[in-house]
Amino acid sequence: MPNTTSDNYTFGKTFTIADIVEEAFERVGFPNVTGYQLKAARRSLNILFQEWGNRGLHYWEVGTLNLTLTQGEREFNFYRYPSDMPTTGAAALQKSNGLNTTLDGAISSTGATSGITMDSITGMNNQGTIRIGTEDITYVGFSGSELTGVTRGAHDTTAATHSDGATVTNYVPGFSDIEQCSLRTNMGGNTQSDAALGKVDRSTYSGYANKESEGTPSNYWVQRFIDRVTMTIYPTPDASNAAKNLHIFFVKRIQDAGTYSNATDVPYRFIPCMVSGLAYYLSQKFRMEKTQPFKLLYEDELARALQEDGSAASTYITPKAYYPNI
């Protein structure tokens, strides 16, 4: 009797968009699909991912980011995509999307993927994207202060040369919302400390009499637009807070499907409901009689995945004393 297992855990990594579409269409009753049906399925998959944005917090899309505070600067913009960033006007002067540092040495070649070194990597994400000028560069790690696993001209930007000391912003595409924010003192040192900021709504922020008043930030207000998320802090940082940072827990959007050879930006636990959801969407186009049972299956599998997703915490039960007639 065979007792050998695969010792492999990469199904989700190798389960391509083409495979997902094929599986969904087989459930609908189409073992062979046309080019138009492939295109329609990929479009439906992207719509499904957008709909998941209304299904609560997806913990695999939660990340952290650090911002460098500047005296007198209270508004920060987090853009959906590099092409959404303004290049002129007042908005272009606002801090956009991340921690600032500088290049330690010029990048003299548009094809260089090594020797890209930062003056400081304190507070930078362990992997992510930096923006220098109008170019995005992705990386997967550090060797000292040098970026490793570099890809130039990412996110449809163009590789360029950059001078020593050029401003570098640790950039995160696909921003959706800010969950938590803290004022961080002495970042990277053994005396580092965080003080949580309170998240306020529009009416509360509107009630602040002097929004230009400077001091130690204690609250923040988030606005969610089509192309960006804007965070405004209060009070405006003063000189004593200019060397401090904001440490942010943010939520990103789920990445688009892209080409048919791509994998999806979805953990393995959500693969069953993703395929069921796509089959449900496709049934509305090609097999209306199957729409209702597919919807029930999809909602059931999605509910289980959402219940499993997240971060569990300890539960404490405290007895409550009750004294009647006192």
Residue ranges and their predicted role:
Residues S96-S109, T113-S114, D119-N126, R131-G174, ...:
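Small/polar beta-strand repeat architecture
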Residues M1-L99, T129-R131, S163-I326:
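Glycine-enriched, solvent-exposed interface loops adjoining structured elements
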